Amino acid sequence: MIELHQVSKSFNVNGKTVEAVKNVSITVEKGEIFGVVGYSGAGKSTLVRCINLLERPDAGQVLIDGKNLSTLSSKELRVARRKIGMIFQGYNLLKTATVYDNIAKPLKLEGVPKDEIEIRVNKYLSIVGLEDKRNNYPSQLSGGQKQRVAIARALAHEPEILLSDEATSALDPETTEAILQLLLKINAELGITIFLITHELDVIQRICDRVAVMENGHLVEQGTVLDIFTKAKHATTKRFVGSEASFDIPQDLLEKYIATGKLVSLHFIGDEADEPALALVSRKFDVLPSILAGGIDHLKNGTLGKLLVHLKGDEAEYSKAIAYLKESGVVVEEVELL
């Protein structure tokens, strides 16, 4: 378990104090995939580096399985860090070392026996699907393959926690999807807790169980991925998930629709995404629904259907229709112009 209690971290930049992380508290359960999302400068990278004390917090506590890392001696901290692997956007591979040696060298420095190193390197190269690349050099690999080597290197220490600092942000969409599937596999098969930071909402929705949203060093909202997608409260979260969204429909067109009825965002969760609730509205009530835009998001634990709908009818019938949709399990939010 990862517990952050009122963690703060600041830096001195050109004589000025910059507060990168401000009183952040997060609890991540064992075996969970937890994501932190935010725009550039939100404090995400500083926060993730506080977990293994690559950045030592100015205030607050970082607890791993109940143990306060800040109180450990240098030797004890080195031992604790072996259970916390980390991958980065930039891979950080040794250019003059083979794939095998990039994974093996850190183990040698830890004093792992040669036979055990051979076993671990082969095991984790197999898990990341690079058995045939063990004698290649980084320059001979694609970006996705380099990231797989970095993941294998982190796993070779057999950690209980894997930290990911924007690990997919430099990859193309297809390679990103492959890396995300690999992280899901690692989580499911090895039981490793994953704490990742990203500015890509697709990453969050594809693999995370829960998510926190950061802005200007503050944690502004957190919850399950489904709750964040359907019940976003903070303005920053809403900008990310588009819960106030217009699906990129021009503002003047939105104004036209709102002037002639109600504009609502509908979210159909799980099995409800396949139910004809909206189709039944026009039969049961004196309202005319028009679908303006829509889509389906595939979350880690289910499906989320999204529709932007114009409802035309009198206020009483509109209220009945909305009540019916909510009773049918649909999350309804009236869209207002910003």
Curated annotation (Swiss-Prot):
Coiled coil: none annotated. InterPro entries: AAA+_ATPase, ABC_transporter-like_ATP-bd, ABC_transporter-like_CS, ACT-like_dom_sf, MetN_ABC, MetN_ABC_transporter-like, NIL_domain, P-loop_NTPase. It is a peripheral membrane protein. Pfam families: ABC_tran (PF00005), NIL (PF09383). It catalyses: L-methionine(out) + ATP + H2O = L-methionine(in) + ADP + phosphate + H(+); D-methionine(out) + ATP + H2O = D-methionine(in) + ADP + phosphate + H(+). ATP binds at residues 38-45. Part of the ABC transporter complex MetNIQ involved in methionine import. Responsible for energy coupling to the transport system. Belongs to the ABC transporter superfamily. Methionine importer (TC 3.A.1.24) family. GO terms for molecular function: ABC-type D-methionine transporter activity; ATP binding; ATP hydrolysis activity. CDD domains: ABC_MetN_methionine_transporter. Residues 2-241 form the ABC transporter domain. Keywords: Amino-acid transport, ATP-binding, Cell membrane, Membrane, Nucleotide-binding, Translocase, Transport. This is Methionine import ATP-binding protein MetN 1. Its EC number is 7.4.2.11. PROSITE patterns: ABC_TRANSPORTER_1 (PS00211), ABC_TRANSPORTER_2 (PS50893), METN (PS51264). It comes from Listeria innocua serovar 6a (strain ATCC BAA-680 / CLIP 11262). Its main location: membrane. The complex is composed of two ATP-binding proteins (MetN), two transmembrane proteins (MetI) and a solute-binding protein (MetQ).
